[in-house]
A protein has these predicted regions:
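Short, solvent-exposed loop/turn segments at the edges of secondary structure
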Residues: 5, 79-81, 136
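Active-site acidic catalytic loop and adjacent metal/ATP-binding pocket
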Residues: 52-106, 210
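Long, His/Glu/Asp-enriched segments that create or flank divalent metal/ion-associated functional microenvironments
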Residues: 140-141, 211-274
Length: 275
């Protein structure tokens, strides 16, 4: 994790980048053999050739399918290029997900130049899903998407997510189950991040956002909505109407700061009462 774009895997000074960024942040003890395998894989990735010898393509495509769907730009696809674990096994790279508390388009609300338009965010293009960075600066996604077979597989995973989970009604069933499961705990939680009423409103809004996002992605796959930012900027008439969506209901940076302070106070009160 870093507030700077340190983990984008795109660097001109490759050797220094490997030593100072990758290995210094390793979560496990590494051997020289481990280092050589990782370096070889990153070098192959940088060439854009023979990607299957360096990347676990199927796993990484699945990772990006979810990242793109949930509109998580506090991640590799955002301007910071962070919040993931780079995992290497047998010379193949994978990306492990981490830190989703600003997913569902809430991260852009807190940027220095906030992006708050729900129509833009929910229709965000699946083929150029990066925010305030370039495709070239995110080589894992870029190099895979340049391969026709990988792009096709990525689209198929997005379609599978839409058909198997959203258009089938499974998502709404699961959403109600999860909401009911935590409802009483949220209502009674003395350290809650928000009021119970705010929680209920956010649950309803999250369901609406996910259903609209799924519909937009399906229309992009069918070419009814443009799937790149350049095309969308040229023709916004095709975008899904999101005028009844308020993403800020889900919370943003300021809400987290205020809620964190409230939570600390409530937690201290609970601890004192238990003495």
């Amino acid at each position: 994790n870093s507030l700077k774009s340190s983990f984008d895997l795109w660097k001109s000074s490759f050797d220094d980048y490997i030593d100072k960024i990758i290995f210094e942040n390793a979560k496990f003890d590494t051997t020289e053999a481990d280092k050589h395998r990782l370096i070889d894989a990153l070098y192959t990735l940088s060439t854009g050739e023979d990607l299957e010898s360096a990347v676990n393509v199927d796993e990484v495509l699945r990772y990006f399918t979810v990242q793109v769907f949930v509109m998580n730009w506090d991640s590799y696809l955002g301007m910071t290029g962070h919040n993931y674990l780079l995992y290497e096994e047998d010379g193949l790279l994978q990306m492990l997900p981490w830190d989703y508390n600003l997913a569902f388009a809430t991260y852009p609300l807190g940027m220095s130049d906030p992006l708050t338009d729900a129509e833009t965010l929910i229709n965000y293009p699946i083929d150029t899903p990066l925010m305030r960075t370039s495709m070239e600066e995110r080589p894992v996604f870029y190099e895979l998407m340049k391969e026709a077979d990988c792009l096709k597989q990525y689209h198929e995973y997005l379609a599978k997510l839409h058909e198997g989970y959203f258009s089938s009604g499974r998502f709404e069933t699961k959403m109600k189950m999860w909401a009911n499961l935590i409802d009483e705990y949220v209502k009674q939680d003395p350290t809650a991040y928000c009021s119970y009423a705010d929680h209920l409103e956010a649950v309803d809004m999250l369901e609406k956002i996910c259903l609209l996002r799924s519909e937009s992605i399906q229309r992009q796959l069918e070419r009814q909505i443009p799937s790149t930012m350049t095309e969308q900027n040229a023709d916004r008439e095709q975008l899904l109407d999101c005028s009844d969506v308020d993403i800020q209901v889900l919370g943003d940076f300021e809400d987290l700061k205020k809620a964190g302070h409230r939570q600390d106070q409530a937690l201290q009160k609970v601890l004192r009462s238990n003495k």
